[in-house]
Amino acid sequence: MIDQYKHQQLRIGSVSPQQIRAWAKKILPNGEIVGEVTKPYTFHYKTNKPEKDGLFCERISGPIKSGICACGNYRGIGTEKEDPKFCEECGVEFVDSRIRRYQMGYIKLTCPVTHVWYLKRLPSYIANLLDKPLRELEGLVYCDFSFARSIAKKPTFLRLRGSFEYEIQSWQYSIPLFFTTQGFETFRNREISTGAGAIREQLADSDLRIITDNSLLEWKELGDEESAGNEWEEKKIRRRKDFLVRRIELAKHFLRTNVDPEWMVLCLLPVLPPELRPIIQIDGGKLMSSDINELYRRVIYRNNTLTDLLATSRSTPGELVMCQEKLVQEAVDTLFDNGIRGQPMRDGHNKVYKSFSDVIEGKEGRFRETLLGKRVDYSGRSVIVVGPLLSLHQCGLPREIAIELFQAFVIRGLIRQDVASNTGIAKSKIREKEPIVWEILQEVMQGHPVLLNRAPTLHRLGIQAFQPILVEGRAICLHPLVCKGFNADFDGDQMAVHVPLSLEAQAEARLLMFSHMNLLSPAIGDPVSVPTQDMLIGLYVLTIGNPRGICANRYNQSNSNCRNYKKEKVYKNDFKYTKELYFSSSYDALGAYRQKRIHLDSPLWLRWRLDQRVVGSREVPIEIQYESFGNYNEIYKHYQIIGSVKIEICCIYIRTTAGHISFYREIEEAIQGFWRAYS
């Protein structure tokens, strides 16, 4: 469909019977109205032509061959001659055969039928809207029981119950036995209600605004109730409040989309165009048919049987009518979702028939395989690996993938810079991988984001935009913090990369889809970019240290003098140091690490600013050293305080590691960058 802004879109939902009839109804030039499928036949076994008013009728769906009617007459399509537009003998229009791909039909159901997707699928929309148990509604739909209509001050048959000396055990089975078909219909229309018609009456009588107001009022009353301390009652109230919220949202959705709840009960059943459920002739003259055709035939057979019972057989018991209505309901259920009520319907080879649900849903369904799973231009695919040097909004593209994705842009750049005179020469330079090619590719990629997608795309974070960076190898590099949104890890997962071409797509990628702009879950608001797996292990290794602090040296056998807190440690590089080093700034400490004088977990003393207190109020120093000039040194578990007689505290040294310093610097720079960006 096309909306008021001329955007092509697809909407799936309930439609009215009038809309279904409008889709399928067709008025021929002679004034005859066609569109209703009344016969369960497909092709005649002798002529191999579609049966009239059958599932492949040419009057309803159009001719099999363009411009040729069922009689074999030919008329040119689109000619301006005064030839008739349809054949008066067979009633087939002279139109293009492609009409059979979208011209629908319909089956007029003798009794209302509940749509099984709205009844049996969880959550059950019908049960939520009517606020009734699903088991009770199922029994009503499949004629297992019925309820009495409210007829005030009128004598009714059901009021005789209780006047007898004994009670009839099961009225739902005994009542129809006393009536003929015509009498039972009169009785049922007057006093009882059962089947999908009863559901339709209740849905038609429901006022969505009243449902919303009453549900909201009940929700507030439950919230105002004081807790009784009973865990079971609190759980029951919480479950009821959740149900009321779902009911309010469902009612608002019906109001917002202008959908009547009674449309969930079908009176007209749409019939798919013939080309979407074909019958194909294979070698040997055998026919292969879509499973949908057999399910449609089953519905038409049972519907016609019910029509005959109501129209001709006046002596048929009412119980037989109810049983036939149940069979029609089950046939339509099988058409929509085979096996939803138990054992699925099978063919002669014990193969399960594929219903609408099987055709649509799943990885091999119509949407994911045919519509969403298509290969597109300007896209690639590769395994993902971790990129520890990437920023959050960057991804690493292998040169082989990048040159293919941006080849058209590189060719344009080569021609504009007069490096190549035409497209052929430009492609040859790309094949030879000349240095100028990579320079132009770098320029193109700087201003062009790419989209990364990991299947299955279950929510909007499954596809995000990144700034591409050229990397070596054949794997896509990804920042580990964005893995949670994709539900990805680095154990062999593959991701697809797409290039947005239009200016609108590039603007959407930059403004809405960049990874650093999708840090919170759109569903619950929790952070998505949180460290997991590899990052947690890396942070642990980076900040590992002895929790005992300086006390770890006290009982070290390699220390001959505990007072100097010496610690001898041998590393793989075969160098030793016997004293913990002192550094005046974090820059000096990281410089020593880069010069390989210390390791990430090497303990060291770092001078700390006096305005940032690290002293515990009740902590007792391990040792206090005094000097001859009055200076003193208080040694604690994780820090030292150096003071003098004139100045209480001259400086503070904290005991840390190069890994802790590096981690702190990264956090500090990130916070400062955040404040600069938003100040």
Curated annotation (Swiss-Prot):
EC number(s) per entry: 2.7.7.6
Substrates-to-products reaction catalysed: RNA(n) + a ribonucleoside 5'-triphosphate = RNA(n+1) + diphosphate
Molecular functions per Gene Ontology: DNA binding; DNA-directed RNA polymerase activity; magnesium ion binding; zinc ion binding
Cofactor-binding details, from the entry: Binds 1 Mg(2+) ion per subunit.
GO biological process: DNA-templated transcription
Gene3D superfamilies on file: 1.10.40.90, 2.40.40.20, RNA polymerase II, clamp domain, RNA polymerase Rpb1, domain 3
Binding residue positions for Zn(2+): C69, C71, C87, C90
SUPFAM superfamilies noted in UniProt: beta and beta-prime subunits of DNA dependent RNA-polymerase
Major subcellular site: plastid
Function, in words: DNA-dependent RNA polymerase catalyzes the transcription of DNA into RNA using the four ribonucleoside triphosphates as substrates.
Family: Belongs to the RNA polymerase beta' chain family. RpoC1 subfamily.
Quaternary context: In plastids the minimal PEP RNA polymerase catalytic core is composed of four subunits: alpha, beta, beta', and beta''. When a (nuclear-encoded) sigma factor is associated with the core the holoenzyme is formed, which can initiate transcription.
The protein's name in its UniProt record: DNA-directed RNA polymerase subunit beta'
Species this protein is from: Phalaenopsis aphrodite subsp. formosana
Lineage of the species this protein comes from: Eukaryota, Viridiplantae, Streptophyta, Embryophyta, Tracheophyta
